[in-house]
Swiss-Prot record:
UniProt-recorded name of the protein: tRNA modification GTPase MnmE
TrmE-type G domain: residues covered: 215-370
CDD domains hit by this protein: trmE, TrmE_N
Enzyme Commission code(s) on record: 3.6.-.-
Keywords: Cytoplasm, GTP-binding, Hydrolase, Magnesium, Metal-binding, Nucleotide-binding, Potassium, tRNA processing
One GO location term (cellular component): cytosol
UniProt keyword Magnesium present: yes
One matching Pfam family: TrmE_N
Source taxon at top rank: Bacteria
Enzyme class: hydrolase
Amino acid sequence: MSIDTIVAIATPPGRGGVGIVRISGPNAYAIALCLNGNKALQPRLATFCSLYKGNNEVLDQGLVLYFKGPHSFTGEDVIEIQAHGSPVVLDLLIKESIAAGARLARPGEFSERAFLNDKIDLIQAEAIADLIQASSDTAARMALKSLQGDFSKKINQLNEELIYLRMYVEAAIDFPEEEIDFLNDGNVSQLLQKIIGRLEDIRSQANQGVLLREGLSLVIAGRPNAGKSTLINNLAGRDVAIVTEIAGTTRDIMREHILLDDIPLHIIDTAGLRDSDDLVEKEGIKRAWQELKRADCVLLVVDINNPDQQNSLLNELRLTLPNKIPIITVYNKIDTTKLTAKCDEHTVYLSAKTGEGLDELKKVIKQVVGYQPTEGQFLARRRHLQALDEAKALLLTGQSQLTNHKAGELLAEDLRLAHQTLCEITGEFTSDDLLGKIFSSFCIGK
């Protein structure tokens, strides 16, 4: 439990009908009495009060709500003052609260206290920020599922199975004189494989959540005049890039953000890739390659009337980019041929000018990045994926120790490390540095 009391404005900056000031800590109730002229407050009831300055001058009127700890969001005594949404009034309430003994809260400190007081776990704390920042209806619903504990329950169930397996393995090590060889009776191997399978399922679901939360960096590349800028204009539904018949019109990076079936898509148009003596164009090409190396997915746009462009540039991309970055080849300008729009796993035929084939392109993008919306989906972060991948690697190492070497002690250690890694997701075992990084990204007042 914290020894100091914090205060912050909990509503967005600017003017509004209502503004909320939140106070949390051991002196929250006493500070509220200083502000409302010593008018008694009942827990979990809204009380209409005049709000005073230190000189007993009325500064506003509003509702004051008292949540007595531990039955509050933070687990501490919490006061919420609903005043008129004037920045001046809210600032005065903050100043009076500080004068009465509070200090200004750090970003995310209310949620941090809720976590430290076991009111929420780390996944739920992150979900609060994700819900506030959600970019679509689906992302908001999935963030709410994480806040309600859907993701946490899956991790906790996995940990329970892992704890049982650890007990089984360590019992086999501690009691080697037993007639039954627990490590070789097949039960340990079956339990371990079941846990690995469940972890893979959770990882797949979490990946969908990461796509919804963070979106994709989609870089459009190709030779000059292949139709890249026309394509980004069509995807955006408006003219964001200059389009001319002159090759090399695009010199710098062009960015646009859209939603693709609720996935935030960060589209990046780049300069045409070719050898050039023009200093400005060379810089644009250099930046294009930098963006390509950071991409989640690359669209290689090829003029269908010049298909020879495709082979040399595709080979160059494959040699230069990491293998994990998928490349979709887009044959553009089918409106100048007798071809119709079509697609397969990594290839699309379309017309960026007319929009024919655009739906096929969107379908292929979702397939290539593995987006498959399912029931029970929740929002997740990249750190969750990293922890799940690390835990899986440890379990596979332990499986190898069991299968190839019958090394019970080494298996037990890998299981322990995997368990600890999974606990980092919910915050049961988490470094102070990680906590500071997570909560500092929150809004003040949350």
